[in-house]
Design a protein with these regions (language model features):
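A short acidic, amphipathic alpha-helical/loop segment
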Residues: 2-8, 69-72, 166
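Conserved catalytic alpha/beta core of Sir2/sirtuin-type deacylases, generalized to analogous enzyme cores
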Residues: 4-8, 98, 109-111, 115, ...
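Generic secondary-structure signature for well-ordered alpha-helical cores
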Residues: 11-15, 55, 115-123, 138-145, ...
Length: 172
């Protein structure tokens, strides 16, 4: 399934995962490679991850207005090296230029990529030891610490961080 192959790829290659609003939850939010949702209003560590990535592997992402903060370069950097995978060939490079565009079902493309990695004996690395993962994880932790007081706030009207925190606690 999509979650399993994405997580396998991310862990095997030590790739921090920034989701789009429509794909949030493909890997658990508490996974050390989960960097939140790409959006101008998203967590700063998600934007930092995209702004500083060597390569952006965009899986089924159409780079919509919400995700990109208005199609500019506030979320996706101007000089980004993007590999875009989409089932719709007209989506490839439509918003941002791509270094490589791959037409196909993202689950199938990821599964094929994993097979190639296995054939080439690219072993699973301890992703938590990757300097890049350590860097973005530190940014994530800093952000989590900065919003912790907002999650506990008793202010009226309710703070959005408190609202979402309480909803997460209440829902199964």
């Amino acid at each position: 399934d999509a979650q399993k192959v994405l997580l396998d790829l991310a862990e095997r290659m030590a790739i921090p995962v920034v989701a789009t609003e429509g794909n949030k939850g493909l890997i658990p939010d508490d996974h050390s490679l989960a960097m939140g949702v790409a959006s101008i209003h998203g967590p700063q560590h998600a934007i930092y991850t995209l702004q500083n990535a060597d390569v952006i592997l965009a899986l089924g992402c159409d780079f919509g207005e919400f995700t990109t903060g208005g199609f500019g370069n506030k979320v996706v950097p101007k000089d980004a090296k993007i590999i875009q995978v989409d089932i719709d060939p007209t989506a490839l490079g439509k918003v941002y230029p791509v270094a490589s565009g791959i037409t196909g079902n993202t689950d199938t493309v990821i599964a094929d990529l994993l097979e190639v990695l296995k054939e080439r004996k690219v072993d699973r690395q301890p992703y938590h030891l990757s300097p890049w993962v350590k860097e973005v994880s530190r940014k994530k932790e800093e952000w989590e610490n900065s919003v912790a007081p907002l999650r506990a706030s008793g202010k009226v009207p309710i703070q959005r961080f408190r609202l979402f925190h309480d909803l997460r606690q209440a829902l199964p």
